[in-house]
UniProtKB/Swiss-Prot annotation:
It comes from the Bacteria. SMART domains: Haemolytic (SM01234). The keyword Membrane applies. Could be involved in insertion of integral membrane proteins into the membrane. This is Putative membrane protein insertion efficiency factor. It holds the Pfam family YidD. It comes from Nitrosococcus oceani (strain ATCC 19707 / BCRC 17464 / JCM 30415 / NCIMB 11848 / C-107).
Amino acid sequence: MKNILLSLIIFYRYALSPFMGNHCRYYPSCSVYTQEAIQRYGGFRGGWLGLRRLLRCHPFCPGGIDQVPEIAKWRSKS
């Protein structure tokens, strides 16, 4: 699953993104963020972090620098 998701992100970045323009309000871009999250945490957790990031990336969001969090910062407390 991890490799399939990473392949889709790479396809998006090189085949679709050049035609859509650079509109991401965050650094790193949403595709780079999601790719790093999936590589670090796997398909499910990394995909969830990427989806949350995509939902935050809209015209009314101020954006800024948003790195992939360390696991201790976003894991639920027990």
